[in-house]
Design a protein with these regions (language model features):
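Catalytic center-proximal scaffold of phosphoryl-transfer enzymes
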Residues: 1-246
Length: 246
C-alpha cells in the first residue's frame, strides 16, 4: 500500500520535501535513543507520503525519488542536491530565508538591516496573498510576481551582497545573509515556474504532528517499527483506515 502511494505521488511534477528527527530505541545496549529521521514528500494541498530512515544522508531521498524528474522544493538541505533524474529542478523556500533574518532581529531588536530584510520578504508574500484573494490562476500569479515581486527579490539579493561585506560572518545577520546568497539560485527559481509556491510551509506543517508527538510517545520502539510509523502517518493523511487494511 505504501509503495502504491509513493508511485502515485511520483506522478506529480512538483513536490515539496522536509525531514524531522524521530528518536528510536536501538536495543544495542547503549541505552540512548538513536536520532533517526522521518522524511516527508508531498504535493502542495494534496497527497503526502512519509519515509523512515535511520540517517539524514542523501541515501533516503535517492531511494524514495529514484529517477523522478520534476520540481522539488526544500529548505535547501544539501542532501536534496544531486538526486533524482537529470531534469530534476531544485527550488528554495523564501520563508526559510526570512526566518533567518527574524532570528537576527530576535538577537538584536534594533538591527535595522535585519528588520528591513524581513519587511522586504514580507512584501513578496503579500503579492501571493493578493493572488489568492483574487483567486488567480498559477499563470496569473506568476505574471503578478514578475510585475512586482521579482524586482523586489533582486533588491534583496543586492542588499545581501552589500551586507556580506560589512557584517560578521558568524553573527545572526551574517548567517542570514550567507544563507540567502547561498540559496539564491534556488530562491530565484520560484519566479520561473507558475505552480511553485514561495514557501515550503505546507511540507513543514505536515510535520508538526510528528514534532508534537515526540513529546507524547518519546521515541519509536525499534528500527523495524520506523517504517510502520511512516506508513501510518501517510495513511492518516490519505484517510486510509490502517486497521481495516492491515
Amino acid at each position: 500500500m505504501v509503495e502504491a502511494m509513493r508511485q502515485d505521488l511520483l506522478r506529480a511534477s512538483y513536490l515539496q520535501a522536509d525531514e524531522t528527527i524521530v528518536p528510536v530505541q536501538m536495543h544495542d545496549g547503549r541505552g540512548a535513543d538513536h536520532q533517526a529521521y522521518l522524511w516527508q514528500y508531498g504535493k502542495p494541498g494534496g497527497e503526502t507520503v512519509f519515509d523512515f530512515q535511520l540517517g539524514r544522508g542523501r541515501e533516503g531521498p535517492i531511494k524514495f525519488l529514484g529517477q523522478w524528474e520534476g520540481i522539488l522544493q526544500t529548505d535547501g538541505y544539501q542532501a536534496y542536491d544531486g538526486i533524482g533524474g537529470p531534469k530534476l529542478v531544485h527550488v528554495g523556500c523564501w520563508t526559510h530565508a526570512r526566518r533567518k533574518f527574524v532570528d537576527a532581529v530576535k538577537v538584536n531588536p534594533q538591527d535595522g538591516e535585519a528588520i528591513k530584510m524581513v519587511t522586504r520578504m514580507d512584501a513578496l508574500s503579500l503579492v501571493d496573498r493578493h493572488a489568492r484573494e483574487r483567486q488567480m490562476s498559477d499563470e496569473e500569479r506568476l505574471a503578478l510576481r514578475h510585475e512586482h515581486a521579482e524586482s523586489w527579490a533582486e533588491e534583496i539579493r543586492s542588499e545581501c551582497e552589500t551586507l556580506s561585506r560589512a557584517v560578521l560572518p558568524k553573527s545572526a545577520l551574517g548567517q542570514a545573509v550567507a544563507y540567502t546568497l547561498n540559496m539564491w539560485a534556488k530562491l530565484r527559481r520560484c519566479f520561473d515556474y507558475a505552480e511553485v509556491e514561495l514557501s515550503n510551509n505546507l511540507a513543514e506543517n505536515s510535520m508538526r504532528p510528528v514534532a508534537l508527538g515526540r513529546k507524547n510517545w518519546l521515541h519509536v520502539g525499534s528500527a523495524k517499527s520506523g517504517p510502520k510509523v511512516a506508513a501510518i502517518r501517510g495513511c492518516r493523511i490519505f484517510c486510509v483506515n490502517v486497521l481495516r487494511n492491515n
